[in-house]
Amino acid sequence: MVRILVVDDNPSVRHYLRALLEQRSTWQVCAEARTGKEALQRVVKNRPDMILLDFQMPDLNGIDVARQISSLFPEIPILMVTIHLSKQLAEEARRVGIRGACAKTDVGSIVEAVDALLHQGTYFPTMSAANR
């Protein structure tokens, strides 16, 4: 069973991501967090196999959270799931150890990205010219 931590300040988005992920019989959301600080606590307590992480949260942004998690647990793949996806954000995400990024609204890419990261890959979609 793959244990996944879902981090988003919006409870509706956390519910949506949980429902999406748990359609796979081998994926289980082991914990949820609504802030960056909660995410750090949940990682230490639950030791997930993977993390889905929002970019914009009330206390710390996803880049700062990922930087801290990656320094402590570099083996845990992090997928940034955001509505703020841009080429610049994706490049910054790579630099801090995030292994993938996709739009919250793209159900297909979320599942595809999780699959890629679980198989030691990365997932950064090609950005359109408007986002460069």
Regions found by a protein language model. Give the residues of each.
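Conserved acidic segment of CheY-like receiver
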Residues: M1-V13, L17-L21
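Active-site residues of response regulator receiver
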Residues: D8, D54, T82
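Acidic catalytic/metal-coordinating carboxylates
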Residues: T35-E38, N61-D64
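Active-site beta3 strand of CheY-like receiver
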Residues: N46-L52
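The feature encodes the CheY-like receiver
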Residues: P58
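Short amphipathic alpha-helix used as the core "switch/output" element in two-component signaling
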Residues: I63-P74
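Alpha4 helix (beta4-alpha4-beta5 surface) of REC/receiver domains from two-component response regulators
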Residues: D64, L85-C102, G108-E112
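A short, hydrophobic beta-strand element within the central beta-sheet of small alpha/beta folds
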Residues: E75-S86
